[in-house]
Regions:
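Surface-exposed extracytoplasmic segments
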Residues: 1-193
Length: 193
């Protein structure tokens, strides 16, 4: 399947269209799948289940969500300074996160300045996903925070952060290629409690 952006097919596309989504090209996203971004069922479910029926998540005309997910391509603004990288957390003794890195990207204050787009004003764009995707970007928390916020207005109404309560990787990321941490041993392992 194709997954330029995480969670679109898993969380927003209806079950009846999931296979179709995997078989089509991003050039067809606006025609076939934009409706799922403009009227995200997950926003409705968050309002009903998490907030008891009176939640803050806008459920209609989500042009902000469509702007992130349609078309399903990773969008990267190359006019900015280099991205900040995740390490082993801000207090890691030998491999801390770069100064200014936030797993919550723009919602955690991790922003860059673009010279080619207005972004959220004065060229401010996310320091991570959905402006590219770095190891350490907590895409679930960023996406859920975006769903319950309203990024269509100026200034944006930010609610959260919200998400899955997983706030770090169990092993530090590398700051040199290949950046990913060493994989867990599949045969001899223990579970963290």
């Amino acid at each position: 399947g194709r997954q330029g952006n995480p969670l679109f097919n898993e969380a927003l596309v209806a079950i009846a269209d999931k296979d179709l989504y995997s078989r089509t090209s991003p050039t067809q996203d606006a025609q076939l799948f934009q409706k799922y971004a403009l009227t995200p069922e997950l926003a409705h479910l968050l309002n009903v289940i998490v907030f008891g029926g009176n939640g803050p998540a806008p459920e209609m005309n989500r042009t902000d969500i469509a702007g992130i997910f349609i078309p399903d391509l990773i969008k990267v603004d190359l006019s900015t300074a280099g991205a900040r990288l995740a390490g082993g957390g801000p207090a890691h003794p030998t491999d801390p996160d770069d100064a200014g890195f936030s797993r919550l990207g723009i919602f955690g204050g991790d922003v860059l300045v673009s010279t080619v787009q207005a972004g959220f004003g004065n060229g401010v764009v996310p320091g991570g996903w959905p402006n590219g995707r770095r190891f350490g970007d907590d895409v679930v928390d960023i996406a859920v925070t975006a769903l319950i916020s309203d990024l269509r207005v100026s200034p944006p109404i930010i609610r959260g952060p919200a998400g899955d309560n997983v706030d770090h990787n169990d092993v530090a990321y590398n700051k040199v290629f290949p950046y990913e941490s060493t994989p867990q041993n599949g045969r001899n392992h223990t579970h963290n409690n």
